[in-house]
A protein has these predicted regions:
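Short, Lys/Arg-enriched N-terminal segments with co-localized hydrophobic residues
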Residues: 1-14
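N-terminal core-entry segment
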Residues: 15-189
Length: 189
């Protein structure tokens, strides 16, 4: 029993440190800190991702996702290609379906796996729009998502534990969306 309690405390301490690091890094990352090469590459990734979404616009899953997203909202976000306005989460969902459907989006191969990190852009676009942000905010939040997705899988071999590396995608989406919304360190944590 004492061992289980120590293990629980160790996990809680580790999670607290990770949360503290991610929230601190998220609020400290500024567009002005990004090298021009990173900004240019991120612009290309965002444009490519929007192209993937538009290419999948007429697919059956995309139509279903847009139909599911027909919900009015006081602070709406836009579904790519349609002008449809809905809740930020449903816009991110519908956009994410379109971004991912054709499987033409980017891929990363890391030490312990990989993933399609441009999937995370759906989680960035809606909050940037809702807070009336612009390209700089979208680029900064996208870079943040990519950094989480590229670096975390190289530190932990989730595949050996039968976990998919997209677990990090969920974390990256949450932190990047929080950055895009302009949340404080405390609100992110």
């Amino acid at each position: 029993e004492a061992l289980a309690l120590r293990a629980t405390r160790c996990r809680e301490d580790t999670m607290h440190k990770i949360t503290e690091y991610l929230s601190s890094y998220a609020v400290s990352l500024k567009f002005s800190d990004l090298p021009q090469e990173v900004v240019d590459k991120t612009k290309r990734v965002i444009i490519d991702t929007l192209g993937c979404a538009l290419g999948a616009y007429t697919s059956e899953p995309s139509k279903i996702a847009r139909a599911m997203a027909e919900v009015p909202c006081a602070r709406p976000a836009t579904v790519i290609g349609s002008g449809q306005r809905t809740t930020p989460d449903l816009a991110a969902f519908a956009n994410g379906v379109m971004i991912r459907y054709l499987d033409y989006n980017d891929i990363n191969h890391s030490k312990y796996g990989g993933g399609h990190h441009s999937d995370d852009i759906a989680a960035v676009l809606s909050p940037v729009e809702v807070v009336h942000g612009g390209g700089k905010e979208a680029i900064t939040a996208t870079v943040l998502a990519y950094e989480i997705n590229y670096n975390f899988p190289d530190q932990v071999d989730l595949l050996a534990k039968s976990w998919d590396t997209m677990v990090f995608g969920v974390i990256a989406c949450g932190v990047a969306a929080a950055k895009a919304f302009g949340l404080s360190k405390e609100e992110i944590a």
